[in-house]
């Protein structure tokens, strides 16, 4: 692969959620080149079986490696919870997930911890296990929020119906007296305004995106892979409709990106490097 320092970091999610990780990377590692992939054709991930998720991530990692990435960040809690260990055993490229950094961030803030996440992430028990491993004295309550991702992807963040759904999902956690709330899905940061309007002021929100980017920086330093030069423009690719993703991403990026469509089913035959797009 040549000089690893100048190779891009790969980020992937099922959709818009990973943009929260992308923006954290822009802030903390502005010199790094990035490839962002959204598996929008198979969104949402939260109701997929473990077998399906592992296969999806295999396909994405195969494509990412063909693009020459030096590292991959799973900007998706569901795939981090279900597929991370399997994928790490199958691919040479270093892969970072959200669960462990997010759990460590949570226990640094409080002891009565609520986790909002997809059904698959909740079912996996990954956050609860990681939080209790980091602090056995912590108390953890999890709440699946299956409605959140479709509402965010449909750009219904400011819809009164959305606030009612968020209130319904948060209420059981508030009744437990949580002092910390973990965004256990990268999409949920997009609802932070709604969520924080409902939470008492003393409840601290933890965004694992910030912590996984810090872990990414530490890994790059350890490997000697930090990019000493200016970054290339961010490259965006999706498995679904490029125009739809570009329009939806515009509000979060501040500009409308150029987006390439990738057919993951044919990726082994056609995994040629992406042309650089504006970002």
Curated annotation (Swiss-Prot):
Catalytic-site annotation from UniProt: 76, 185
Pathway linked to the protein: Cell wall biogenesis; peptidoglycan biosynthesis
Keywords: Cell shape, Cell wall biogenesis/degradation, Isomerase, Peptidoglycan synthesis
Function recorded in the entry: Provides the (R)-glutamate required for cell wall biosynthesis.
Family: Belongs to the aspartate/glutamate racemases family.
UniProt name for this protein: Glutamate racemase
Reactions mediated catalytically: L-glutamate = D-glutamate
């Amino acid at each position: 692969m040549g000089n690893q320092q100048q190779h891009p970091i790969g980020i992937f999610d099922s959709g818009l959620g990973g943009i929260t990780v992308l923006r954290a990377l822009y802030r903390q590692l502005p010199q790094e080149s990035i490839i962002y992939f959204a598996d929008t054709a198979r969104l949402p991930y939260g109701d997929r079986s473990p077998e399906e998720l592992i296969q999806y991530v295999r396909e994405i990692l195969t494509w990412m490696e063909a693009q020459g990435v030096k590292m991959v960040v799973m900007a998706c809690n569901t795939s981090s919870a279900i597929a991370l260990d399997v994928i790490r055993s199958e691919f040479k490229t270093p892969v970072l997930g959200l669960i462990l950094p997010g759990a460590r961030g949570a226990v640094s803030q409080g002891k009565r911890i609520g986790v909002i996440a997809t059904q698959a992430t909740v079912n996996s028990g990954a956050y609860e296990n990681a939080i209790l491993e980091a602090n056995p004295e912590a108390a953890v309550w999890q709440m699946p929020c299956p409605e959140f991702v479709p509402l965010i992807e449909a750009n219904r963040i400011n819809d009164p119906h959305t606030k009612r759904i968020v209130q319904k999902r948060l209420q059981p956690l508030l009744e437990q007296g949580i002092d910390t709330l973990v965004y256990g899905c990268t999409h949920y940061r997009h609802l932070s305004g709604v969520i924080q309007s409902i939470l008492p002021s003393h409840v601290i929100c933890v965004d694992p995106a910030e912590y996984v980017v810090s872990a990414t920086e530490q890994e790059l330093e350890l490997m000697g892979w930090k990019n000493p030069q200016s970054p290339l423009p961010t490259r965006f690719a999706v498995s679904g409709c490029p125009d739809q993703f570009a329009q939806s991403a515009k509000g979060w990026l501040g500009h409308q990106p150029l987006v390439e469509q990738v057919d993951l089913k044919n990726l082994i035959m056609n995994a040629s490097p992406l042309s650089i797009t504006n970002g």
